């Protein structure tokens, strides 16, 4: 059971290793009532698979590619924990941004993501981009209606 949930998370993360998101595949990997909190605790929770896809699409307007290097994965029950190094290349200036991320995923019995939380240092990213913490907060504020 745990291996299948971990595999579902690995497959889900692999969908983001691209310049153009396949929103149909992302939506299929999510439970209809899934939730996503892109930056715990600062960003608002995004509710629903369609809203999550819209928010992911919005974020992909900022960068042109993404790579999630999975360092560690573990699970307990329906929860999968990941330790990653994420790299994105910004559209504006072609700058590469690298950050350490702890992702926590709740996975249902159908191996779909029902709750996705990401923990990373927003100020580290702000420093790499060259913006203030407040500007970074505004950039990461989820833009979808809840």
Regions found by a protein language model. Name each.
Residues 23-77:
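A solvent-exposed, acidic/Ser-Thr-rich amphipathic alpha-helical stretch
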Residues 12, 25-27, 34, 48, ...:
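Hydrophobic pocket/interface hotspot
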Residues 13, 39, 91-92:
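A general structural-boundary detector
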Residues 9, 13-16, 30, 56-59, ...:
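Hydrophobic alpha-helical core bundles mediating ligand binding, dimerization, or RNAP-core interactions
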Residues 4, 59-146:
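A beta-strand edge to alpha-helix "cap/lid" segment located at domain peripheries
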Residues 2-32:
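Short acidic-aromatic low-complexity motifs
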Residues 16, 42, 115:
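Short, flexible active-site loop motifs that bind/organize anionic cofactors or intermediates
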């Amino acid at each position: 059971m745990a291996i299948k949930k971990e595999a579902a998370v690995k497959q889900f993360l692999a969908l983001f290793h691209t310049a153009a998101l396949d929103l149909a595949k992302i939506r299929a990997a999510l439970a209809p009532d899934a939730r996503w909190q892109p930056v715990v605790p600062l960003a608002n929770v995004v509710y629903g698979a369609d809203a999550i896809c819209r928010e992911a699409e919005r974020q992909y307007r900022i960068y042109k590619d993404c790579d999630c290097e999975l360092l560690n994965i573990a699970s307990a029950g329906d929860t999968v924990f990941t330790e990653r190094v994420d790299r994105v290349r910004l559209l504006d200036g072609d700058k590469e941004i690298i950050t350490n991320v702890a992702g926590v995923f709740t996975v249902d019995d159908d191996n779909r993501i029902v709750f996705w939380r990401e923990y990373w240092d927003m100020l580290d990213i702000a420093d790499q981009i060259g913006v203030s913490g407040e500007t970074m907060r505004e950039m990461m504020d989820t833009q979808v209606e809840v």
